[in-house]
Regions:
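Conserved acidic segment of CheY-like receiver
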Residues: 2-13, 18, 49
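Two-component/phosphorelay signaling modules centered on CheY-like receiver
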Residues: 12-29, 118
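Short hydrophobic/Thr-rich beta-strand motif most characteristic of the beta2 strand and flanking loop
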Residues: 26-34, 40
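Short amphipathic alpha-helix used as the core "switch/output" element in two-component signaling
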Residues: 39, 61-74
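Active-site beta3 strand of CheY-like receiver
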Residues: 44-50, 55
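C-terminal output helix
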Residues: 88, 106-115
Length: 120
């Protein structure tokens, strides 16, 4: 369990669900706001970040955090979590460095498959 995942989502329910899916194989750290996500990323240096697009600070807070992470850590692996499956938003995230995305609602197998693609 040496690989670390940062789960950044304002929903405690979503963080709990993702933690339950992934904590058997990976170390999990969490953040409930964009600011906390930035702080946790700097402190914990996760191998992969699962980042919600819409956070309490604003509709595109996750995109702002993605940009900050990418500027400070080129090559950081960030998978966006979105309830907004719009092509324009997804393209914007990929342009800013997101390696992938998961659309809510998602199932357990989709999460595992996506994470394993980047962490094994």
């Amino acid at each position: 369990m040496d690989k670390k995942i940062l789960i950044a989502d304002d929903s405690l329910f979503m963080r709990t669900m993702l933690r339950d899916i992934l904590s058997d194989k990976y170390k999990i750290v969490e953040a409930g706001t964009g600011l906390k996500a930035e702080q946790q990323f700097k402190k914990e240096k996760p191998d992969l970040t699962l980042l919600d697009i819409i956070m309490p600070e604003g509709e595109e807070e996750g995109i702002r955090v993605l940009q900050k992470i990418g500027e400070a850590n080129p090559g950081a692996r960030v998978v966006m979590i979105t309830a907004v499956g719009q092509d324009a938003v997804i393209k914007k995230c990929k342009k800013l460095g997101a390696v992938d995305y998961i659309v809510k609602p998602f199932d357990r197998e989709e999460v595992i498959k996506t994470v394993q693609k980047y962490l094994g």
